[in-house]
């Protein structure tokens, strides 16, 4: 009625609640202890069909409540020393990580499409053009680009190591970083027929990454630069991320509006 498009974000395999309630679904180390991230939060096993069903049923509930889209986040394998020694319970040479992630999203997508719901996957921006990152987290950009309806690479400049894209500090170069990342996306997905290709809707940085050496403050200017980079790469959609949900309205103004505001100050 109000022309608002609703998206339900569901965190997938980093799930300490499910891991505690169903320990047999938790991803474990050889000593039987759960695999946890840097904050001590447990992960469940992305190979387990019971986990797929749980995540699909959660999404179906959201669809029944009226959400237009399901956005699966943390739809990947964990990283770190714990993850490297985890017991996944399968022959990972015969069934690699990337296939498990693709199979889960196809499984959930089939069910959710029956309810008329759009299915989106959040992925690391660094998987674009990096086979090493693909193998680590199990997110294959090209494969997922023809599995889900929309794909959202997290191309936050702060998440690229200094020197990437030939930039001394990517975080200090928001336009150049996002443009390079999105041009990489265009190149990687170009062989997929347009009718079969996912919509690309990148996550953009709406926060200041104080932990990055050489970082800059992110305000309206930096947000607008990233948005322009998306457009200049040939894409039309984008979303912003700030973990505290504090967003700068200035970043959403058009060039004419910014100029008017500056003239009125």
Q: PLM ranges: what are they?
A:
Residues 13-64, 224:
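Active-site-adjacent "subsite" loops/lids of carbohydrate-active enzymes
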Residues 15-38, 78-92, 139, 172:
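Aromatic- and acidic-residue-enriched segments that line the glycan-binding/catalytic groove
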Residues 40-76, 136, 140-147, 229:
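An active-site-proximal structural segment forming one wall of the substrate-binding cleft
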Residues 39-53, 90-99, 166-175, 213-217:
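The substrate-binding groove and active-site-proximal loops of carbohydrate-active enzymes
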Residues 148-159, 171-265:
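Substrate-binding cleft of secreted/luminal carbohydrate-active enzymes
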Residues 1-11, 80-119:
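Aromatic-lined substrate-binding rim segments of carbohydrate-active enzymes
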Residues 11-15, 75-77, 124-128, 156-158, ...:
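Active-site beta-loop-alpha junctions enriched in small/polar residues
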Residues 1-34, 69-72, 114-116:
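Glycine-rich, aromatic-flanked loop segments that form ligand/cofactor-binding clefts
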